[in-house]
Amino acid sequence: MTAQELSIRYEVPGARRFGNYIWGSLMCLGGLGFLTIGISSYLDFPILSLVKSSNIQFFPQGLVMCFYGVLGFLLGVYIWLLILWNLGEGFNEFNLETGYVRIFRWGFPGKNRRIDLQYPIQEIQSIRVEIQEGINPKRIIYLKLRGNREIPLTRAGQPLSIQQIETQAAELAKFLQVSLEGI
């Protein structure tokens, strides 16, 4: 066996997805729009010439618009920070040469930003697949360890297709020579 055949590495994308860029931009712009209308209703002066804020009373409509504007803007900034930090990005590495499985992810900034888990391959009991269809589909591959610990291996947010999940899970189970559950 060559070194390439002795290890498998799957990259896991983080928060830098197209949808997050769109949502972050919309939340920031929408929040600023609401906040501007709320402030202009308080000042009784049109800050934006496109909207007549004189029709909006400050109490209660302008105050509520200020509240939603601040909330929307802060949520947009939070999404942009997730994109900046690339939260959740990492890899899953299965190495038969060293005899270890390594699961790495980037977390929130701070002392524990690097989430780096390493387990001996002998600890792996099986690979489990969970597939739920519906409005919010759930397609996750779990690494099942001794002691009933389960570690998710797939990314959150945009689920992979059923074919991709099944192929990846079968490839992992065959490579690690463990059973495959849930398919």
Curated annotation (Swiss-Prot):
Family statement drawn from the similarity comment of this UniProt entry: Belongs to the Ycf4 family.
GO CC, alphabetical: chloroplast thylakoid membrane; photosystem I
Location in the cell: Plastid, Chloroplast thylakoid membrane
UniProt name for this protein: Photosystem I assembly protein Ycf4
Domain of life of the native organism: Eukaryota
Keywords: Chloroplast, Membrane, Photosynthesis, Plastid, Thylakoid, Transmembrane, Transmembrane helix
Alphabetical GO biological process terms: photosynthesis
Entry's transmembrane regions: 21-43, 63-85
Function per UniProt: Seems to be required for the assembly of the photosystem I complex.
HAMAP family associated with the record: Ycf4 (MF_00437)
UniProt topology in membrane: Multi-pass membrane protein
NCBIfam families per the UniProt record, alphabetical: PRK02542.1 (NF002712)
